[in-house]
Swiss-Prot record:
Name of the gene encoding the protein in the UniProt record: cmk
Keywords per UniProt: ATP-binding, Cytoplasm, Kinase, Nucleotide-binding, Transferase
Subcellular location per the Swiss-Prot or TrEMBL entry: Cytoplasm
NCBIfam families hit by this protein: cmk
GO biological process: nucleobase-containing small molecule interconversion; pyrimidine nucleotide metabolic process
Source organism per UniProt: Shewanella woodyi (strain ATCC 51908 / MS32)
Disulfide bond entries: none
UniProt-listed SUPFAM superfamilies: P-loop containing nucleoside triphosphate hydrolases (SSF52540)
Reactions catalysed according to its record: CMP + ATP = CDP + ADP; dCMP + ATP = dCDP + ADP
InterPro entries the UniProt entry points to: Cytidylate_kin, Cytidylate_kinase_dom, P-loop_NTPase
One Pfam family it belongs to: Cytidylate_kin
GO cellular component, one term: cytosol
Protein name, entry field: Cytidylate kinase
Length: 230
């Protein structure tokens, strides 16, 4: 396939900083944003709202085909605004329950295929920042710029703990670490679109570096590989 606009893919495990960097890049460049992980969390939330079982691939696929989701940037420290059928669900989809459910529904091949078409439709001028787990390997495999962000499981658990605490959720960091390791194992070893860096992706370990440094590395890589982008 050929993309209709320049696409920068950002893949990696949960908590590596993909969401923050994707938002900052989209705002800095004035590009569209696709949060693939949020799409799966939105689908999981829609399934919960509509009483669809998380192991019912037929019903989940039908729900995915009609999923109405939008991403709105420019909200500053509040992050990306995620809208499902006209309702702001930005906080709802960040719960640990929804996060775990998203990983489960993402394991179904036909569900992924239904959402694949929707994700590719986000590629519009002037460009797209695509944040996910298989953006560079599957969804936008011909994207000119691919990044892969990673960090230790312990660092990612701490970040998730801080994030959920700030949002008022009562969480246990040891439980979070266990869930993150289990999710990594599921995502990296599933038969369909496992979580791995694309062969031509720039891998950035964010464990010991700050947001600004990661952003500068990403921008420099984009500018090097895409002419006319600054």
């Amino acid at each position: 396939m050929s993309e209709r606009a320049p696409v920068v893919t950002i893949d990696g495990p949960s908590g590596a900083g993909k969401g923050t960097i994707s938002q900052l890049l989209a705002e800095r460049l004035g590009w569209k944003l696709l949060d693939s992980g949020a799409i799966y969390r939105v689908l999981a939330l829609a399934a919960i709202h509509h009483n669809v079982e998380l192991d019912n691939e037929d019903s989940l696929t039908l729900l995915a085909a009609h999923l109405d989701v939008q991403f709105i940037t420019g909200n500053g420290s509040k992050g990306i605004k995620v809208v499902l059928e006209g309702e702001d669900v930005s906080n709802d989809i960040r719960s640990q329950e929804c996060s775990n459910a998203a990983s489960k529904v993402a394991a179904f091949p036909r569900v992924r295929e239904a959402l694949l078409r929707r994700q590719r439709a986000f590629s519009e001028a002037p460009g797209l920042i695509a944040d996910g787990r298989d953006m560079g390997t599957v969804v936008f495999s011909k994207a000119p710029v691919k990044l892969y962000l990673t960090a230790s499981a312990e660092e990612r658990a701490q970040r998730r703990y801080n994030q959920l605490q700030d949002k008022g959720f009562d969480v246990n960091i040891d439980q979070l670490l266990t869930e993150i390791k289990e999710r990594d194992d599921r995502d990296m070893n599933r038969s369909v679109a496992p979580l791995v860096p694309a062969e031509d992706a720039l891998v950035i370990d964010t464990s010991q570096i700050g947001i600004e440094e990661v952003l500068n590395i990403a921008l420099a890589h984009i500018e090097t590989n895409l002419s006319g982008v600054s």
